[in-house]
Amino acid sequence: MFGFLKKVADYTRDAADAANYLIQGLAVTFDHLRRRPITVQYPYEKLIPSERYRGRIHYEFDKCIACEVCVRVCPINLPVVDWVMNKETKKKELRNYSIDFGVCIFCGNCVEYCPTNCLSMTEEYELAAYDRHSLNYDNVALGRLPTSVTTDPSVQPLRELAYLPKGVMDPHDVPANQPRAGQLPAEVLKSLSLQQDSLQGDEGESLQDAPDQDQPKG
């Protein structure tokens, strides 16, 4: 008799624990239902990086003076600067410049300390390749302008997930139905057109009021 009651008590305790665990799991699920998604349907949806995003490095060959400051400030001495000394002008002549993005940590030190601003960080982040050797960009590849996600009609650009309202540090604190901070390119163009229309309307009203002021009073 006591053995049967013990089994019933153990079964009841296990059932209560299972129900408790189930409720805890459902609580987490329902809590995430009220949060905004943190993923996008890549590659059909792409994020618009922020202005200070550190993407692929853009290089301008004509501005480079082969000073090798970028090599000295790089934590891993990554940039390869190939130059020769011109005996007539006694100045360095740049032959080739390359950066291996398979090793680069995108710290931005080379961009920060470049004296001629020939290096700049772009918003391009799609650098995946089948061969790691193809990630070694020479001065020709580095000189290409970055591609924009907003020019492809098959891709829907999205706001950057890091754009949060003022004073908010955790993206989960923003309700799912609240729009993100920042604007899409179409919204920026629309706001600019509205501003231009309002300015033109103000100019038209000022021109109409000007002749009335010049007329003599009867």
Curated annotation (Swiss-Prot):
Signal peptide range in chain numbering: none
Cellular component per GO, a single term: plasma membrane-derived thylakoid membrane
Subunit structure: NDH-1 is composed of at least 11 different subunits.
Domain of life per record: Bacteria
Region: Disordered, residue numbers: 192-218
Keyword field contains Transit peptide: no
All residue ranges annotated as the 4Fe-4S ferredoxin-type domain in the record: 55-84, 95-124
Annotated [4Fe-4S] cluster 2 binding sites: C74, C104, C107, C110
Gene, per the UniProt record: ndhI
Gene3D superfamilies: 3.30.70.3270
Name listed for the protein in its UniProt record: NAD(P)H-quinone oxidoreductase subunit I
EC number: 7.1.1.-
Enzyme type, top EC level: translocase
Annotated membrane topology: Peripheral membrane protein
Catalysed reactions listed for this entry: a plastoquinone + NADH + (n+1) H(+)(in) = a plastoquinol + NAD(+) + n H(+)(out); a plastoquinone + NADPH + (n+1) H(+)(in) = a plastoquinol + NADP(+) + n H(+)(out)
Cofactor notes: Binds 2 [4Fe-4S] clusters per subunit.
Cofactors demanded by this protein: [4Fe-4S] cluster
Family: Belongs to the complex I 23 kDa subunit family.
Binding site for [4Fe-4S] cluster 1: C64, C67, C70, C114
Keywords associated with the record: 4Fe-4S, Iron, Iron-sulfur, Membrane, Metal-binding, NAD, NADP, Plastoquinone, Quinone, Repeat, Thylakoid, Translocase
Native organism: Prochlorococcus marinus (strain MIT 9303)
Pfam families in the record: Fer4_7 (PF12838)
PROSITE patterns noted in UniProt: 4FE4S_FER_1 (PS00198), 4FE4S_FER_2 (PS51379)
Function, as annotated: NDH-1 shuttles electrons from an unknown electron donor, via FMN and iron-sulfur (Fe-S) centers, to quinones in the respiratory and/or the photosynthetic chain. The immediate electron acceptor for the enzyme in this species is believed to be plastoquinone. Couples the redox reaction to proton translocation, and thus conserves the redox energy in a proton gradient.
Location(s), subcellular: Cellular thylakoid membrane
Keyword Nucleus on entry: no
